[in-house]
Amino acid sequence: MLNSTYRIYYENAVGRVVDDPLGFARLTYQSSVRVADSFHAFLGHVTRLMARRGDGCLLVDQRRMSPFTPDEQRYVIEQWLPRTVQEGGYRYGAVIVAEDVFARLATASVVTAVRELPMQYRYFEQEAEAIAWLLHQQRQG
């Protein structure tokens, strides 16, 4: 739930990137159809925010997300995640799972494909549990 203390870092039709006051970056997908340029721009801003924050923690809210297309999956696997780990310091991803089962499957395929990257993903049904896990990782890191 967004409130006035959240700092929106970037927003387009794909979703919203927020510098969460609890101490991590937050990516929230919208349910709209994604255009490649907008998708790439959106994820690029996530990378920049993570690099600026330097804590390696990202809350990924996929509740309203539609499934990744094959091209989106390739982009995330081959370009965005490796770059965000290297340039953004991405280490911990707390994913609030999508309502759409096909979106869940698409995300699982991405995570399986990048399991060699030095990062951890955990899936959650509830936002509060995702936040608690992410903050715990931050304290441990």
Question: Where in this protein do the model-derived segments appear?
Answer:
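Amphipathic, Lys/Arg-enriched alpha-helical "gate/interface" segment within cytosolic domains
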Residues: 1-141
